[in-house]
From Swiss-Prot:
Organism whose genome encodes this protein: Methylobacterium nodulans (strain LMG 21967 / CNCM I-2342 / ORS 2060)
Encoding gene per record: greA
Described purpose of this protein according to its UniProt entry: Necessary for efficient RNA polymerase transcription elongation past template-encoded arresting sites. The arresting sites in DNA have the property of trapping a certain fraction of elongating RNA polymerases that pass through, resulting in locked ternary complexes. Cleavage of the nascent transcript by cleavage factors such as GreA or GreB allows the resumption of elongation from the new 3'terminus. GreA releases sequences of 2 to 3 nucleotides.
Record flagged with keyword DNA-binding: yes
Keywords (A to Z) from UniProt: DNA-binding, Transcription, Transcription regulation
Source species, domain of life: Bacteria
PANTHER family per the UniProt record, alphabetical: TRANSCRIPTION ELONGATION FACTOR GREA (PTHR30437:SF4)
GO biological process, one term: DNA-templated transcription elongation
Keyword hit for Ribosomal protein: no
Protein name stated in the entry: Transcription elongation factor GreA
Amino acid sequence: MEKVPITIRGFAALEQELKHRQQVERPRIIQAIAEARALGDLSENAEYHAAKEAQSLNEGRVLELESLISRAEVIDVAKLSGSKVKFGATVQLIDEDTEEEKTYQIVGEPEADVRSGRVSITSPVARALIGKGVGDTVEVSTPGGGKSYEIVGISFSG
């Protein structure tokens, strides 16, 4: 079973989502199925079919979350240090074309969210940054073409 690296914050979010799906969503969906069944003929009962589909999606996500949680390798980023980019690092970059500053934290796949500045360790950006230090320039291949960034800061905080 392949371990999945994840931060403490990311692991807590997975546990919270699992708890919500099991304790809130599951009972709500079961109630919706019961109410739809009470309406009669199930073959043409849109409410019943919608509730069953919601149940299927919810249970699928529950299984996925349980698998991720069982395979998680929780890493306390606050205990990490160093001068090179690695899992958990928060990296400040300057786009060499636009001079725009960007900040990314390198996290596990389940917790990645580019809009929040968290990129997956398997992403092109993270792969280009791993092992590099402040002052290094990295080339990143993106769907819109190549980008050059200079690393101007590396920090580790939870």
